[in-house]
């Protein structure tokens, strides 16, 4: 979870 706390499921970096 770099920039996306809940979007980590999609892209852990993005």
From Swiss-Prot:
Enzyme Commission code: 3.-.-.-
An individual GO BP term: proteolysis
Disulfide bonds: none
Presence of the UniProt keyword Oxidoreductase in the record: no
Key words, A-Z: Aminopeptidase, Hydrolase, Protease
Enzyme class: hydrolase
Influence of temperature on activity: Optimum temperature is 45 degrees Celsius.
Regulation: Stimulated by DTT. Strongly inhibited by zinc ion, Fe(2+) ion, Cu(2+) ion, mercury ion, N-bromosuccinimide and N-ethylmaleimide. Partially inhibited by cobalt ion.
pH dependence: Optimum pH is 8.0.
Listed GO MF terms: aminopeptidase activity
Superkingdom classification of source: Bacteria
Residues passing through the membrane, by range: none
Subunit (UniProt): Monomer.
Role this protein plays: Inactivates puromycin by catalyzing the hydrolysis of the amide linkage between its aminonucleoside and O-methyl-L-tyrosine moieties. May have aminopeptidase activity.
Protein name as catalogued: Puromycin-hydrolyzing enzyme
Organism: Streptomyces morookaense (Streptoverticillium morookaense)
